[in-house]
Structure formats: structure tokens, C-alpha cells
Amino acid sequence: MFVDLSDKKIVVVGGGNIATRRIKTLLQFTRNITAVAPKTTMELHELGKAGFVDLINRPVKRSDFVMAFMVIAATNDWKLNDEIYRVCKEQGIYVNVADDKSKCDFYFPGIYMQAEVVVGITASGLNHKKARRVRVAIQEAMEASDNEE
């Protein structure tokens, strides 16, 4: 299932490598992203500085989730991630706890985009390497098909 995220508020809690990767994936589909973290990667800092992400450099507050469609908890604090999960479930917000598959309402597929075609591949969070191999195979097939035209 693909969801139009263009007008949906997305909150990412965390500023490390996983949060940065998730944000870069989401930026392919929306610019309505808020990242909340006391510290961030340099890449995420630059995305905020360039205006691609609303970057809030402080610990997360419950009020950060007001009107959120989805929240990604990508901190290195499992207690905080668990609290984020609990708050989101109470408020009916889709949530993804990056390091706990059992606390994910959605997964991040491997994405391949070419012109108007978007392909998403997931192994339901179970086998990332296999999903990546399938994405590469699809990418190679799509590129070969384009070369034939």
C-alpha cells in the first residue's frame, strides 16, 4: 500500500544515522517532516539548514505529536522509544519504533524510483538483505528495459 504523504505531518524523534536515513527516504515523497533531537548527524543538520526538514534541537515533548499522521522513534534510548510508542497508540498515530519490529505499524521498504514508477520492496522487517537484493534486481531489470526502448 502506498499512502500520499504530501499533506501529512511526520515527526521523527532522533537525530542519528537511522533517523537521517528514514528522513532521506521520506523526503522523496514529502517535505512535511519535523525532526526532534538534542543532537543530530551533520547530514541531518544540513537538511534542516537547507529547509528540507523542520529541525528542533531539544528533547522531544508530547506536544510535538499534535496533528501528527505518523511518528518514527529512532533514538538510542529504548525507554524513550517505548514511551513514544505508548503515546502514539493512545492518540491513534501510526508509529514505527526503528529497533523493535513488534512496535511498528508500518515498515520502510527498499525504494526504487524511475520517472513515474515507484517500486517498494519489503520482507516485513525480517530479511533486509533479501529485500535489498530484490530491489537491485528490479532496478537492473527496469534499467535494461529502458535501454531497449
Language model segments and positions:
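Glycine-rich adenosine-cofactor-binding loop
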Residues: 1-22, 130, 149
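Hydrophobic beta-strand scaffold residues
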Residues: 33, 55, 94-95
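Residue-level detector of alpha-helix initiation sites
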Residues: 17-18, 78-79, 125
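ADP-ribose/adenylate-binding Rossmann-like module
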Residues: 70-75, 81-107
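Adenosine-phosphate binding glycine-rich loop
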Residues: 4, 112-149
